[in-house]
Structures are given as C-alpha cells and as structure tokens.
C-alpha cells in the first residue's frame, strides 16, 4: 500500500502524521508520497533534505485534489492500494489494519473510510501526547463522539477499483 498525503502549510502536522504511520502501522518512508501543494512553511526544504522520501512539489499551489492524486499515481507508477490521508487527521492504533480488513471483506468493496475525530486546530506536541488526550477524553469539548461524520480526510482505495476507474475527474 502507498500512502499519499497532500499538505499545504501543515509541516508540523505532517511530521506527526508520518511518525504515527511509522509507529502504529509500520509504514516506512518509501511507502509514503508527500505532496507539497505550494506550502511556505519549510516543508519543501525538509522534503528535499530527506533522500528516502517520495515527494512532489506543486509550485503554484491550489492544485485540485484529484489532479494531485492523478499526478502522484502516474509519477510513482502506483500499482497497489492507496491510502489518501490529510495530515490534520490522526491515525489511531489498528485503524489502518482494520481499514485493510474491511477493504477486502467483499470483492465488491472498492474504498473504505474510517470514522474520524477532527480536533480543529488544536494539536498535541507529539503523537503519544495526542493518543493520551483521546484515551483520557481530553479532546475538544465540542466534539461529540456519538455523532462522528465520515469525511474525505482519510480513504483507502483498492487497486482493482483504481484500475477500473482510471484517472479521477479533475474539475
């Protein structure tokens, strides 16, 4: 599986996300594709200093999400499942493994999404601290855990579905 993360001025969140993916899902840098969509927060320089990191730079910024995903798929010749992930969402323990299990629970399933907890602009200092906040119930007071909504911030796409669909509509 390849993980595509599109970031725009989310350098610190991206670093936390990469660490969470490594710690909780065993996803290594070679399985990541980071897309900097015109950030001005030092992300580009950081990516250029990491020789094992797969990345794309969209200099103009503001590229459509589907155009970026199409570009990443073509540039890195992705021929496996893809996890599209927004850096402002936190991966919880076992969530990627569970998504993979559900993705292959039926041959007709082409994509799965988890329930997500979005904690606004509040961020923890590191991933361990963030997980502790959730375990202790110290998340944003306005978040109702009984009414979580699905979002496109995290979606896992099956390779066979991607082959059938082809490129994503870029309008």
Model-identified regions with their sequence ranges:
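Short beta-strand segments
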Residues: 5-6, 34-35, 86, 112-116
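Acidic/His-rich active-site region of diverse nucleotide-sugar glycosyltransferases
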Residues: 67, 98-166
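Short beta-strand-to-loop acidic/aromatic patch adjacent to the donor-nucleotide binding site
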Residues: 79-90
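Glycine-rich, basic loop-to-helix element that forms the pyrophosphate-binding segment
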Residues: 59-76
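Short, well-formed alpha-helical segments that are part of the catalytic scaffolds
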Residues: 10-24
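Cell-envelope/extracellular polymer assembly enzymes that use nucleotide-activated donors
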Residues: 1-2, 31
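A conserved acidic beta->alpha catalytic loop
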Residues: 36-44
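Acidic donor-binding/catalytic loop of UDP-sugar-dependent glycosyltransferases
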Residues: 42, 88-102
């Amino acid at each position: 599986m390849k993980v595509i993360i599109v970031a725009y001025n989310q350098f610190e969140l991206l670093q936390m996300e990469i660490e969470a993916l490594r710690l909780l899902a065993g996803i290594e840098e070679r399985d990541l594709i980071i897309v900097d969509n015109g950030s001005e927060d030092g992300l580009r320089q950081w990516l250029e200093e990491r020789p094992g990191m797969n990345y794309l730079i969209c200099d103009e910024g503001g590229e459509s999400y589907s155009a970026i995903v199409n570009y990443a798929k073509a540039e890195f010749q992705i021929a496996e499942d893809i996890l599209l992930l927004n850096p402002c969402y936190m991966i919880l323990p076992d969530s990627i493994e569970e998504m993979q299990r559900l993705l292959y629970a039926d041959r007709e399933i082409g994509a799965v999404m988890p329930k997500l907890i979005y904690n606004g602009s509040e961020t923890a200092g590191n991933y361990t601290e963030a997980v502790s906040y959730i375990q202790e119930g110290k998340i944003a007071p306005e978040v109702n855990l009984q009414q979580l909504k699905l979002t496109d911030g995290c979606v896992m796409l099956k390779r066979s579905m991607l082959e059938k669909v082809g490129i994503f509509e870029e309008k």
